[in-house]
């Protein structure tokens, strides 16, 4: 069976693994998912990730991050742009997540970047998700 929204599947796996307090989660790999995982790593939401080749598309093994008493670093994930309703933002309309405490992941002509980078570079694009 084909998957209609692989990015939503990735975000759901992260959310479910985080709620169940798993150390690692496995996600089917793609270039876009690798870029999103890299943003999560740079922003400090995950410990790290490895790409495991399995002879097909590969697997991203992501190490989730928790605080001292196993409190969650990722408190919320929301998919914004969906296959049935794409959401785009102009460079002047890029959203702030929780007043700057969270990040918006945006797909632009310069690749997948955070809302802060998009504002700095003056580009708009498709708003993929909010993470806080």
From Swiss-Prot:
- Decide whether keyword Ribonucleoprotein is in the record: yes
GO MF terms listed in the record are: rRNA binding; structural constituent of ribosome
InterPro entries in the record: Ribosomal_uS8, Ribosomal_uS8_CS, Ribosomal_uS8_sf
Gene Ontology cellular-component terms listed: ribonucleoprotein complex; ribosome
The alphabetized list of GO BP terms reads: translation
* Self-association state and partner proteins as the record states: Part of the 30S ribosomal subunit. Contacts proteins S5 and S12.
Record-stated family:
Belongs to the universal ribosomal protein uS8 family.
State the function annotated in the UniProt record: One of the primary rRNA binding proteins, it binds directly to 16S rRNA central domain where it helps coordinate assembly of the platform of the 30S subunit.
Record's protein name = Small ribosomal subunit protein uS8
Q: Which organism is it from?
A: Alkaliphilus oremlandii (strain OhILAs) (Clostridium oremlandii (strain OhILAs))
